[in-house]
UniProtKB/Swiss-Prot annotation:
SUPFAM superfamilies: L domain-like (SSF52058)
Single GO cellular component term: extracellular region
Lineage per the UniProt record: Eukaryota, Viridiplantae, Streptophyta, Embryophyta, Tracheophyta
InterPro entries for the chain: Leu-rich_rpt, LRR_dom_sf, LRR_extensin-like_regulator, LRR_N_plant-typ
Full protein name: Leucine-rich repeat extensin-like protein 5
GO biological process: cell wall organization
Signal peptide: 1-31
Function of the molecule: Modulates cell morphogenesis by regulating cell wall formation and assembly, and/or growth polarization.
Glycosylated residues in this chain: N98, N293, N344
Region (Disordered): 406-776, 817-839
Compartments, record wording: Secreted, Cell wall
Length: 857
């Protein structure tokens, strides 16, 4: 009985306590409601908390910006710009270099990194036409208010720590011509909002964390350059790839697999293509023989099978060909080695059984780890016998042709090209990519119309990733494109150190010399009357992608995205950026040579990966093509990669002659290690025996990369961004593409983000810290001593990466560029191991100037 009584009493006590607590809470809440006891600090704290989680209808973050009534603005557009920039300033969590310190007051045109110019539709009023915060090491996110910058033509924020997604209200930026978000920490699926930008020509999303499939509309859009390498994109490429009018496309270091679309042969304007470091597992389509303008062709480090199509002999502009680390077999067609401009042919780590003698006379070639009789460093007889015992490969079984669905009334899939995108190639309905196995020979002829004359096709001289034999045998991807220096990137601005540009002050970087003939973009672009928006000429900062530590060093470099001819951005007052040189669009595809179907090779057995060429870097760097900035007017930074030019003469400069100070780059050989930064547009010289002589580091202007001759001596790298240092020489960027800029768009002398000052290059950790984290500590300087090249005729170790000087938009002081001594081709002797202090390795072979500096991880 006592126990029962105690239990009842206990239950009663709990009930009474609950009732007491309930009524106490209600009374306290009522007292707060009626008496308003919250202090101002408490109210402010609650407001900030609410704003932190505020989202618009798209889920984008916004900020609460109050405009002081006492502020006076020249016009409503500058008032909107004030709201947008103040919201962005609130969204910045860390600004270690004080780029946004002077973002105060109504004079937004004096803000650091902000450039104004006359509006296209009303020349009597000023508006914000360009933003350049490259290499600022800023952490934060992009608020939705940036959609208020409706007159913006250039938006460059590479090499920062921005995270999150791209705001949906970016679709209001109807005049945006160049978008460079590279080397940040953006994540999520492909930012489809960029497909709604009608004037967009240059898209650079490299070195982020984007994932998922790539939308078909991307290849139906009228772009000139696509750089999506070093992300996490997956799945197969859409079969309408050939509809794209781009001159440069880099999808390296992702997770693509499946077929190489046969429509690839329809890309009539294509000059550089880098598909390395993926998982493509089909045959090379014979239709690639139609690509008459391609200078750099890199499909290394995939799982491609079959034989090399004899139609490759029709790619008459080819300079760099890299198919290493695949499962190719059969005999190499003699027509390939007889290409008139071929400087480097790398086909190591395959299962080829025949090699024509003419290939041995190429300036640079690598045939190691094959099954070639009477050649050194081949696979073991057991490996070759095991591979030859496999059944032959039937290339038709992959079903890599375009979807052959009959023109039923089936509505085209929602993958219709986004506004402004180039129409899909004719005769092919934009039906979802069906994997109907059509013979690869069925590429639809209707390649997407070439992008307007503004297409800054990188000079054909860009070296292919293949490295010349002179350098060590390691097939590191660092081969830099040997593009002749004649392609000074238009408006390439000298790379200025990442120091925050003082408002209105031009960065200390040497003045960017306008690329020869640099003219404002031709009016072919949709923008209304050109506004002279002074955007800093974006010289190709080392676009080199940070080396992926785990990936084997591919012999071919990844081309850094050449910044398309900067849209005519209004010239910022006082800025002496070199005029952007519109490179003439490349001629349409020459009549496609009849593609010969690749011989069915034996079924590819997993390639036996021989030891990667002696690449010194512990982590195999993925070759990245870094667009060298225009050499004009800037002291060339020493090329980070010792890309010794092959014996053949340097490719003739495209329509542009390189700045007088730069001699034409001789064909360069790939050095085993990819240098992190792209070499400046300077003539590249074969590495001289003495390693002590480093080439001078050129200053990069972010926008269009000018051809960079390779200096053998190791340059110092300025930024630390890439994860694992790559040892690989990036080829010189091709001559500056001749861009016809959008007609009315303002001529921006846009200095695209120059590479950061010589920061110490430490491989960035794979995982990015939370976007909120403050500026990361500077990476430790790492001195890599690449081993000397093993045998001549192989990769020569790249020279130390060049020191990049980032040039902020204002005209940098004139820098005296002393050209390095004429290239001495020492095939056997590699340049001294470069000291890798810079950021991500450049993507060799790309003549584009928009350089995403390596991210600071």
């Amino acid at each position: 009985m006592k126990t029962k009584m105690m239990m009842k009493n206990t239950s009663l006590i709990f009930v009474l306590l609950f009732i007491t607590f309930f009524f106490t809470s209600i009374s306290y809440s009522l007292s707060l409601t009626f008496n308003g006891d919250l202090s101002d600090n408490e109210v402010r704290l609650i407001t900030q908390r609410q704003l932190l989680y505020f989202r618009d209808e798209f889920g984008d973050r916004g900020e609460n910006v109050d405009v002081d009534p006492s502020l006076v603005f020249e016009n409503p557009r500058l008032r909107n710009a004030y709201i947008a920039l103040q919201a962005w300033k609130q969204a910045i969590l860390s600004d270690p270099n004080n780029f946004t310190t002077n973002w105060i007051g109504s004079d937004v045109c004096s803000y650091t990194g902000v450039y104004c110019a006359p509006a296209l539709d009303n020349r009597r009023i000023r508006t914000v036409a360009g933003i350049d915060l490259n290499h600022a090491d800023i952490a934060g996110y992009l608020p939705q208010e940036l959609g208020l910058l409706t007159d913006l033509a250039l938006f460059h924020i590479n090499s920062n720590r921005f995270c999150g997604t791209v705001p949906h209200r970016f679709n209001r930026l109807k005049l945006l011509f160049e978008l460079d978000l590279s080397n940040n920490r953006f994540a999520g699926i492909f930012p489809t909002v960029v497909l709604q930008l009608p004037s967009l020509k240059f898209l650079d999303l490299r070195f982020n964390e984007f994932e998922g499939p790539v939308p078909r509309e991307l290849f139906s859009k009228d772009l000139d350059a696509i750089f999506i390498n070093h992300n996490r994109f997956r799945f197969e490429l859409p079969d309408n790839l050939g509809d794209s009018p781009v001159s440069v496309i880099v999808v390296a270091n992702n997770h693509f697999h499946g077929c190489i679309p046969t429509s690839l042969g329809d890309m009539r304007n294509l000059e550089e293509i880098i598909f390395m470091e993926n998982g493509f597992n089909s045959c090379l389509p014979s239709q690639i023989g139609r690509l008459k303008n391609v200078t750099v062709f890199d499909f290394s480090f995939n799982e491609l099978v079959g034989s090399l199509p004899a139609s490759i002999g029709g790619m008459v502009s080819m300079e760099q060909l890299n198919v290493a680390h695949n499962r190719f077999s059969g005999k190499i067609p003699a027509t390939i080695c007889q290409l008139p401009r071929l400087e480097n042919f790398t086909f190591s780590y395959n299962f080829f059984t025949g090699e024509p003698p003419v290939c041995l006379g190429l300036p640079g070639f690598d045939d190691r780890r094959n099954c070639l009789p009477a050649r050194p460093a081949q696979r073991s007889p057991g490996q070759c016998a095991a591979f030859s015992s496999l059944p032959p490969v039937d290339c038709g079984s992959f079903g890599c042709g375009r979807s052959t669905r009959p023109p039923v009334v089936v509505p085209s899939p929602p993958t219709t090209p986004s506004p402004g995108g180039s129409p899909p190639s004719p005769s092919i309905s934009p039906s979802p990519p069906i994997t109907v196995p059509s013979p690869p020979t069925t590429p639809s002829p209707g390649g997407s119309p070439p992008s307007p004359s503004i297409v800054p096709s990188p000079p054909s001289t860009t070296p292919s990733p293949g490295s010349p034999p002179t350098s060590p045998t390691t097939p590191t991807p660092g081969g830099s494109p040997p593009s002749s220096p004649t392609t000074p990137t238009p408006g390439g601005s000298p790379p200025s150190s990442p120091t925050t540009p003082t408002p209105g002050g031009s960065p200390p970087s040497s003045p960017t010399t306008p690329s020869p003939g640099g003219s404002p973009p031709s009016p072919s672009i949709s923008p209304s009357p050109p506004i002279t928006v002074p955007s800093p000429p974006s010289t190709p900062t080392s676009p080199g992608s940070p080396p992926s530590p785990s990936s084997p060093t591919p012999s071919s470099p990844i081309p850094s995205p050449p910044t398309p001819s900067t849209p005519p951005t209004p010239i910022s007052p006082g800025q002496n950026s070199p005029p952007i040189i519109p490179s003439p669009p490349f001629t349409g595809p020459s009549p496609p040579s009849s593609p010969s179907p690749p011989l069915p090779p034996v079924i590819p057995s997993p390639p036996i990966v021989g030891p990667t060429p002696s690449s010194p870097p512990p982590s195999t760097p993925t070759p990245v093509y870094s667009p060298p900035p225009p050499s004009t007017g800037y002291p060339p930074p020493p090329p980070f990669t010792g890309y010794s030019p092959p014996s053949p003469p340097p490719p003739p400069p495209p329509t542009f002659s390189p700045s007088p100070s730069i001699p034409p780059p001789p064909p360069q050989t790939y050095s085993p290690f990819p240098p992190p930064p792209p070499p400046p547009p300077q003539t590249y010289y074969p590495p001289q025996p003495s390693p002590s002589q480093p080439p001078q580091s050129p200053i990069y202007g972010t926008p269009p990369p000018s051809p960079i001759p390779y200096l053998p001596s190791p340059p110092q790298f300025a930024s630390p961004p890439p994860p694992a240092p790559y040892y690989y020489s990036s080829p010189q960027p091709p001559p500056p593409p001749h861009y016809s800029l959008p007609p009315p768009t303002p001529t921006y002398h846009y200095i695209s983000p120059p590479p950061p000052p010589t920061p110490i290059h430490s491989p960035p950790p794979q995982s990015h810290p939370p976007c909120i984290e403050y500026s990361p500590p500077p990476p430790p300087t790492v001195h890599y001593n690449p081993p000397p090249p093993p045998s001549p005729a192989h990769y020569s170790p790249p020279p130390s990466p060049p020191v990049y000087y980032y040039n902020s938009p204002p005209p940098p002081p004139a820098v005296h560029y002393s050209p390095p001594p004429p290239p001495v081709i020492h095939h056997s002797q590699p340049p001294p191991p470069p000291i890798y202090e810079g950021p991500l390795p450049p993507i060799p072979g790309i003549s584009y100037a928009s350089p995403p500096p390596p991210p600071f991880y």
